[in-house]
Amino acid sequence: MSRVCQVTGKRPAVGNNRSHAKNATKRRFLPNLQTHRFWVESEKRFVKLRLTAKGMRIIDKKGIETVLADMRARGENV
């Protein structure tokens, strides 16, 4: 399963670890992904999404119906 937020599209970023001596080694910054079930009243069913904490805040703000409509418009399978 890919580490991509279904709502925001955030994916892992690449950067460096820096030691005290300023040596650089590659590392990945992973998004804060959570699996969460949301009740969709209009469809009378739960929708299971893999999303970041920011994605959950967006759903709290806009509502699950609006976010699902945006995702379906993008071609996301929900």
From Swiss-Prot:
InterPro entries: Ribosomal_bL28, Ribosomal_bL28/bL31-like_sf, Ribosomal_bL28_bact-type, Ribosomal_bL28_sf. Residues 1-25 are annotated as: Disordered. Pfam families: Ribosomal_L28. GO terms for biological process: translation. Signal peptide: none annotated. Belongs to the bacterial ribosomal protein bL28 family. This is Large ribosomal subunit protein bL28. It comes from Aliivibrio fischeri (strain ATCC 700601 / ES114) (Vibrio fischeri). The lineage of its organism: Bacteria, Pseudomonadati, Pseudomonadota, Gammaproteobacteria, Vibrionales.
